[in-house]
């Protein structure tokens, strides 16, 4: 089965081709036009997707050495994301599938991230064995989910304010770093002292997401942002410049330690033997190293996507579509799917909480 995946939920225009579960191409174009604004401008993102979508899809087909007539299925992100951006890829994918008279599969962007850790591990659309805890962490989302082997899942934790990636970007902006600041902080931190300054770690006392789950798995990063701002206001520009790697390392430690502690605690509380991380922040080297070490200490299997599948990409869209089709979990031949803005609105199962 040959699947074309399309992803346009934010500021990456991506198309990928999978053949029997193997990635044949994964073309990603990141929009640089937002850099001067310090964040993504929705209108600009939509226009860039519209400008690039045809050439990106053509490149994906060409690299996979196939034509559009060789495709069996087309899948595209239907949300959550910037509605205008989502609509570009969704409408393009639906129209293309309709014209080719082949099935179209709408994909939940966050669900695709959840399963992106298994792109290189599950050829031929084999589902992961057993349950796992998934940490999906990016600039827009910080979610902890208990994923069951039948593809149902419960969201057991989420951020109560800022997402982890947003915390990286906002503290980076305070430090005068370019957008997106997460990768820059990661690089600076390699030469810094993570114990230079003890920024607060928010370990919220009571869960507001899943009252039935044992333990609290919610996150909060707004206090960290305020603490960094207060700390920097007390320092001279010379001090900040001299200790920039140390401050970056200290900020990173505060964010990563909470992510690791909450995720591992959730696995232990639920007696789950596997953990996966996904989303743009999963590319952070400290998060990968710390989570792997913690999993090894507790005998928990650790799954993480290759670097190219951590950020938004169409390979994960096509991969999840293949998994869902193989297990007969999605309707086929629907060409009138509307985009959705929230994670909850796009869940596949009504029983999910």
Swiss-Prot record:
Superkingdom of origin organism: Bacteria
Required co-factors: Fe(2+)
Listed GO CC annotations: cytoplasm
GO biological process, one term: tRNA threonylcarbamoyladenosine modification
Cytoplasm in keyword set: yes
Keywords annotated in UniProt: Acyltransferase, Cytoplasm, Iron, Metal-binding, Transferase, tRNA processing
Gene Ontology MF annotations: iron ion binding; N(6)-L-threonylcarbamoyladenine synthase activity
Xref: Pfam families: TsaD
InterPro entries from the UniProt entry: ATPase_NBD (IPR043129), Gcp-like_dom (IPR000905), KAE1/TsaD (IPR017861), TsaD (IPR022450)
Protein residues bound to substrate: 136-140, 169, 182, 186, 284
Gene3D superfamilies, per the entry: 3.30.420.40
EC number(s) recorded for this UniProt protein: 2.3.1.234
Top-level EC class: transferase
Record's catalysed reaction(s): L-threonylcarbamoyladenylate + adenosine(37) in tRNA = N(6)-L-threonylcarbamoyladenosine(37) in tRNA + AMP + H(+)
Binding site for Fe cation: 109, 113, 312
Keyword field contains Iron: yes
Cell compartment(s), UniProt: Cytoplasm
Matches recorded under PANTHER family: TRNA N6-ADENOSINE THREONYLCARBAMOYLTRANSFERASE, TRNA N6-ADENOSINE THREONYLCARBAMOYLTRANSFERASE, MITOCHONDRIAL
Reported function: Required for the formation of a threonylcarbamoyl group on adenosine at position 37 (t(6)A37) in tRNAs that read codons beginning with adenine. Is involved in the transfer of the threonylcarbamoyl moiety of threonylcarbamoyl-AMP (TC-AMP) to the N6 group of A37, together with TsaE and TsaB. TsaD likely plays a direct catalytic role in this reaction.
Similarity field: Belongs to the KAE1 / TsaD family.
Name of this protein: tRNA N6-adenosine threonylcarbamoyltransferase
Organism: Chlorobium phaeobacteroides (strain DSM 266 / SMG 266 / 2430)
């Amino acid at each position: 089965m040959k699947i074309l995946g399309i992803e346009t939920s934010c500021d990456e225009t991506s198309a990928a081709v999978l053949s029997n579960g193997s990635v044949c191409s994964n073309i990603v174009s990141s929009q640089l036009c937002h850099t001067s604004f310090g964040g993504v401008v929705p209108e600009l993102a939509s226009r860039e997707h519209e400008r690039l979508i045809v050439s990106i899809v053509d490149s994906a087909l060409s690299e996979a050495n196939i034509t559009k007539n060789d495709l069996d299925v087309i899948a595209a992100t239907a949300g959550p994301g910037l509605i205008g951006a989502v609509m570009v890829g969704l409408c393009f994918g639906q129209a293309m599938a309709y014209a080719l008279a082949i099935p179209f599969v709408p994909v939940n962007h966050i669900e695709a991230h959840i399963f992106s850790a298994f792109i290189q591990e599950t050829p031929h659309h084999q589902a992961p064995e057993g349950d796992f805890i998934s940490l999906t962490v990016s600039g827009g989302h910080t979610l902890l989910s208990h994923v069951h082997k039948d593809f149902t899942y419960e969201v057991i934790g989420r951020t109560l304010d800022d997402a982890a990636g947003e915390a990286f970007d906002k503290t980076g902006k305070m430090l005068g770093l370019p957008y997106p600041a997460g990768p820059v902080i990661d690089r600076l931190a390699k030469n810094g002292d993570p114990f230079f300054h003890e920024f607060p770690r928010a370990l919220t006392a009571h869960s507001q997401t899943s009252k039935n789950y044992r333990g609290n798995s919610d996150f909060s990063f707004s206090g960290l942002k305020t603490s960094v701002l207060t700390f920097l206001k007390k320092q001279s520009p010379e001090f900040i410049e001299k200790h920039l790697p140390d401050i970056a390392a200290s900020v990173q430690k505060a964010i990563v330690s909470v992510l690791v502690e909450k995720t591992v605690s959730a696995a232990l509380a639920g007696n789950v033997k596997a953990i996966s991380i996904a989303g743009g922040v999963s590319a952070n080297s400290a998060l990968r190293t710390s989570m792997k070490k913690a999993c090894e200490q507790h005998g928990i299997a650790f799954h993480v996507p290759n670097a190219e599948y951590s950020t938004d990409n169409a390979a994960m869209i096509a991969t999840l579509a293949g998994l869902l089709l193989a297990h007969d979990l999605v309707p086929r031949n629907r060409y009138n799917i509307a985009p959705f803005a929230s994670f909850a609105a796009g869940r596949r199962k009504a029983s999910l909480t």
